[in-house]
């Protein structure tokens, strides 16, 4: 099995190194990742400046672009083959609830999904790499569980669920404190904290985006709740942003506008 690994923290981050070391035991693994930290770049693609691919001493390839750029370039020419799985991470910090909209980690996995390849975004819920070895081992265990279905896809017999996109958050805890795995829906956060302003040495006002807001929908069944109870959370995602519940309302509103003319 062939796996493409990306991330948004950059090719030198501890999370992607640990993930590579864990997955190379069970698959042929290739790393194509951003040169620099690209957190919160979502699905952004670079369209107005050139990008370059370089190779690090450990064989990782890195690009002066976004996480989605890296996956896009890898899949459209750099690799020369189609991987069976795209994996992104392990991110330094959670990607739960509304985080998934902004996350470069999720954006990289989503790019793989958009190309019809099963994809997984892995994140560790608390910043810092205290238990990154645990997170990497848990990530490998999940991939191993999914291998039979991935092999079916590779042989050309597409199961009904393929492709799929999973968002996985792993508690930053010792292995014996993790309670298991729960499939959960996305929770929600309050709006981001107030923008931070500072004055530059030249007297100019500088602005920094405030921190993520606290959880506001974090009840049972959400990713926030699962990880708070020391479970690994797994959330299946898709890219359909249609508000299906309100479609009938807007159809009626459009009909009234049509009648008015």
UniProtKB/Swiss-Prot annotation:
Residues involved in a divalent metal cation binding: 8-9, 39, 91
GO cellular component, one term: cytoplasm
Catalytic activities: a ribonucleoside 5'-phosphate + H2O = a ribonucleoside + phosphate
Keywords: Cytoplasm, Hydrolase, Metal-binding, Nucleotide-binding
Transmembrane segments: none
Cofactor(s) needed: a divalent metal cation
First-listed, main subcellular location of the protein, grouped into a coarse class: cytoplasm
EC number, as in UniProt: 3.1.3.5
GO MF annotations in UniProt: 3'-nucleotidase activity; 5'-nucleotidase activity; exopolyphosphatase activity; metal ion binding; nucleotide binding
Cofactor note: Binds 1 divalent metal cation per subunit.
Protein's UniProt keywords contain Cytoplasm: yes
Subcellular location: Cytoplasm
Top-rank taxon, per record: Bacteria
Cross-referenced NCBIfam families: PRK00346.1-3 (NF001489), PRK00346.1-4 (NF001490), surE (TIGR00087)
Family listed: Belongs to the SurE nucleotidase family.
Function field: Nucleotidase that shows phosphatase activity on nucleoside 5'-monophosphates.
Protein name: 5'-nucleotidase SurE
Native organism taxonomy: Bacteria, Pseudomonadati, Pseudomonadota, Betaproteobacteria, Burkholderiales
